Amino acid sequence: MHTGAFMSDQQDRIYATSHSQVGRFSFDDTVVRVFPDMIRRSVPGYPTIIDMIGVLAARYAQPDTCLYDLGCSLGAAATAMATLTGDTGNPIVAVDNSRAMIEQAENLLSQAGQAHRVTLQEGDVAEMAFNSCSMAVLNFTLQFIALEKRDALIRRLADATVPGGILVLSEKIRFANDAENALQTELHHAFKRNNGYSDLEISQKRNALENVLIPETLAAHETRLKKAGYRQIHVWFRCFNFVSLLAVR
């Protein structure tokens, strides 16, 4: 069953016309309206990642613990977790700091018949306290959090995760080797062009994300996870400069 990214009839044309000055990217009403199309055409393998988050939830959800979708956007990961854990009783908490995202997520969760399983919260995941959990998802979220706040967030998540519980961390990454970084970036741009984005759209979106999305190397993520107390760290998905890690507590 495909629970993946919520589909949308609205195509992302935000950067299709030339802007004299490109503003900083934000998850506002304009982005929310086209987000399903934007994420599908911009992130290689995004629907697969969402579906496999559901599969991982079915395997790792433990009794009397909650499941977190942190930086939930429209709640696709939370919906996948809810769908494949059935009525286990695990509370699922989905958090985002964008009011526009939360409001639309409420509508989509109702349409998916999962509103009763998922509690939506508007808030900053870098500042919130966590209850005992067996699974947390940071699906392309950490990259938007200030670098100086990332260590503490991952430590607090690890502390809240029960033994055998997991963190799914999906991120756009950079490479220490300049040549590899350039190649992987160009391959990602080729992916976007193949999905209908123009060079103008790719360039303006990249400018908008400058100093908003701050990628790190895979090694930096693995080091942070180990220091926080995760016992096993596995790369379970990778395409170009996008990866998803499975960290086991």
Curated annotation (Swiss-Prot):
Keyword S-adenosyl-L-methionine: yes
BP GO annotations: tRNA wobble uridine modification
Domain of life: Bacteria
The UniProt record lists the keyword Glycoprotein: no
CDD domains on file: AdoMet_MTases
Gene Ontology MF annotations: carboxyl- or carbamoyltransferase activity; S-adenosyl-L-methionine binding
Assigned protein family: Belongs to the class I-like SAM-binding methyltransferase superfamily. Cx-SAM synthase family.
PANTHER family (UniProt xref): CARBOXY-S-ADENOSYL-L-METHIONINE SYNTHASE, TRANS-ACONITATE 2-METHYLTRANSFERASE-RELATED
Quaternary structure and interacting proteins, as annotated: Homodimer.
The name this protein goes by in its record: Carboxy-S-adenosyl-L-methionine synthase
